[in-house]
Amino acid sequence: MRNQILPLLLVAASITANAQQKKDSLYTRTIEDVKLHKTGNPNNARVSTIKSQLDVMETPQAIAIVTHEFIEQQQAQQLSDVVKNVNGVYITSARGASQDSFGARGYTFGNENIYKNGSRVNSGIFPEVSGLERVEVLKGSAAILYGNVAPGGIVNMVTKKPLFNFGGNIALNYGSWNNVKPTIDIYGGLTKNSAFRVNGSYENKESFRDIVQSEKHYFNPSFLYNISDRTQIIIEADYLKHHFTPDFGLGGLVLNTTTNESKLNTLLGINKFPGATWQYQTNEMLTSTVTLNHEINSNWNFNTVAFFQDYTRDFHGTERIQWNLQNNGDYVWKRTLNKQLQEQKYGSLQFNLNGQFKTGKLNHKLLVGADADYLQADTYSYQLQKQDGTFADAGNNFVYGTNGNTSNGNILLSDENTWKSGEMLNSRQKDLNRIPTRRVGIYAQDLISITDKFKVLAGLRWSYLENKSTIVENYLNNTKTYKASSGNPKESAFSPRVGLVYQIDDSFSTFASYSNSFNPNSGRDINNLPLPSSLIDQYEIGLKKNLWKNTLAFNITAYQIENSNLAQTAAFDKNGNINGDTNIKEMTGATRSRGIELDVTGNPTPNLSINAGYAYNNMVYTDTPDSEGSFVEGERLVRTPANTANASIFYTLPKYVKGLKLGFTAFYTGERLAGWNNLKDKNGNPKTNRMYEIGDFTTVDFTIGYQFKKFNVQGRLGNIFDVVDYNVHENYSVNPITPRNFYLTFNYKF
C-alpha cells in the first residue's frame, strides 16, 4: 500500500501550489445542498444515497441526514458519535475496540451496509469523521439499489468536495487522556473550471483503559473539473492508517463452560486490561473514487462511479476474554494468543441514468442502473514460537499465560500478578486463504405521478452473486489447494419494490411501501448442497411533515420485517440420525421485526438547531422446529435494544454575549441481551439460559463555544453523570463506554 501513497502526496502538492483565490463565476453542479445546510431539515434535501432525482418527501422510505454542521457542533470523534443522532440506529458491539458495529430495526450491519460516496466500503476500521460533509442513512431495505444488504438500512458517508471559493480552516483538538488531534481543510479554485480540496488530520491518544493507546493518520485530497457546462468529473482519494492497542475489554463471566451460561463482568474496574502489554493492531485503508456526472438535457442525466479500495488489517494479541468459574469461586481465563494478517482489494463500477418525462397525463421519474464489483479477500495465518523452541498454530489453542507461559495459559481474575505478559513471540507465516467474490446487479424504478398528490413507485433489481472456490496456499509444505465456498457458489435473485405516496402539499406526505431483499447463507443442507438465500419481506408506512416554514421536519415510520426461511441447524442428518454438525442446516426458521420511529430535526430559527428521536423495536423468533439445536419461539434476538432515543439542542445567543453557543445532548439505549440466543433440547424445551441482560443507560453531554470573527473555541463535557455501562459482543468482548471526559477545539477559518 505504501507505494500508492506517494502519488497522492504529489497530487495534493501540485493542487495546493496552483490554488487560486477566485470566486466561482461559472455555473457548476451544486456540491453542497444549500437548503439542507440552511434549514437543517432533511426533508428539504436531495439525497445522493437513493441514486435518483426523487425528493425526500416523495420517497416512500425513512431517510435521515446528519450534516457536517451537526458533526462539528457535537465535536464527534468517530462514526458512532454521528449515527447516534439517527433514531433506531444503535451500536451492537465494539469487538476488540477495532471498529463499531451498528444495527437498526433488529438487524446487524455488515460490510454490505456501510458506504462511502455511494460505494461499498470495508467496515473493519474507524472512519475519520473530520473529512465528512454529511452522513446519510437510508433505513429499511435498500436491496433494489445495492443488492444483498441487511434489511435494517445502510449508512453512506459523503466526504467533503472541492469548492471554487478559496477557504478552509485549521483546528487543534485536545481531550481527556492526552487526546491530541490537529486537523486542516483547504479548498479553492485552480482555474475557472477546476477546483480542489485537501483535508487531513493526525490523532494521538491514550485511554481510560490501562495500556490502551491509539495513533491515526488521515489524508483526503480531491479534484473537480467542469469539462463543459453539462459535464463534470470529480477525483477523490482517501488514506487512513490506524495503529492501536486491540482491546477486548473486561471479558464475560462464564458460569458453565458446557452450556455457555454467562453473566456481565462487574468484578473488574472499567480501566483494567488483562491482555498482553505489547499487543497491537494496524488497520490501513486507501480508497479512490472517480465520479463522472453528465446532463444530457434539462430532463435527463447520468453518472458513473468507479471505486477502488485497498484494505489491510495486521493483528497480533490476545482475544476472546472468557473468565470461567472454578469450584473455589474464582474465575480463570485460559489466555490465548493470535496473529493474523488480512488484505482486501475491492473494486466497483456503477452507472445510473435518470430521466423525467410524460406519457399522456402521467409524469415519470425514471432510474435505470447497473453495478458490478469484485472482492479478493486474503487471510494469512501464522505459527508462533513456544518457549521450548517449537512452533504451533496461533489462535484459540495457543496459550499465553503468566509471563508469556506457552504451556499453561491460565490467569486469575482475582490476581493481577498473573496477568503479566512476556515479550512478543517469534512468528512465521503458515498459509494463505484467498476468497474471490464478484457481484453484478441491474435495476430500474419509476415514480409515476398519477395526480399532483398521488404517486406510485415501482422498481425491480436482478442480482447475481458468485462465491468462487477458496485458494489455500500452505507455505510450510509448499502446496496449493482449492476448497468449495461455504456459501452458494452461484446465486441470483430478484428484489422488487412498490411504494405509494400521497403528497398533500410540498410540506406533508404519507407513504406505504413493500420491498424484498435476500440474505446469502453459509453452510450446507443434509445432502451437502449449498443453502439458498433467505428472502426477507419488509412493509413500511409513515408520514413526513415540515413545520415552522419548512425549517423543521417531523417524521413517523412504522415497519414490519419478516424472514420466513431462516437457516438453522438441521435436527437430523440425511440418515435420520441426530445432527451434531452446526454447519449442516435447514431452512425452517422464521423471525419478525416490528417497530416505530419518530424524529424531529431542523433549525426553527437561525440560532437554534434541534435533533431528537425515539425508536422502538421488537425482533423475535416466530417459528422454529421442536428439535434440538433450534432457537426458541418468542425470544428476543440478542444485541437489539427495544428502546433508543436521542435529543440534541444547540442555541447561539443573538445578543448580550453575541457568538456564545450552548449545547445539550442526551442519548438513551434501552436494555439489551448479550451472549447467544437459547437453543432447544431434544424434547423441544429451552436449554440452560445462554443470555444475560445489560441494563439501559443514558449519557448526557454539555457543550459551550464562542465565536469571534474567524476564531472559534468550543468545549464539551461528555457523559456528565459518569454513567457506567457496556457494549458486548457475544460473551467475551465486554467494552465499557467512555466515562466522564472533556474535549476542546480551537478553530481558525480563513
Spell out what each predicted region is.
Residues 293-297, 301-307, 313-317, 509-510, ...:
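Membrane-embedded beta-barrel scaffold of Gram-negative outer-membrane proteins
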Residues 288-311, 336-471:
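Face-selective signature of the C-terminal outer-membrane beta-barrel domain
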Residues 30-165, 541:
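Acidic, small-polar-rich N-terminal luminal/periplasmic segments of exported/outer-membrane proteins
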Residues 226-228, 344, 363-365, 371-375, ...:
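Structural signature of Gram-negative outer-membrane beta-barrels, strongest in the C-terminal barrel
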Residues 452, 586-677, 745-749:
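Gram-negative outer-membrane beta-barrel transporters
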Residues 131-133, 144-221, 227-231, 286, ...:
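Outer-membrane beta-barrel translocator/receptor signature
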Residues 564, 610, 667-684, 705-750:
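C-terminal beta-signal and adjacent terminal beta-strands/loops
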Residues 203, 207, 222-226, 230-295, ...:
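Acidic/polar loop-and-plug regions of large Gram-negative outer-membrane beta-barrel proteins
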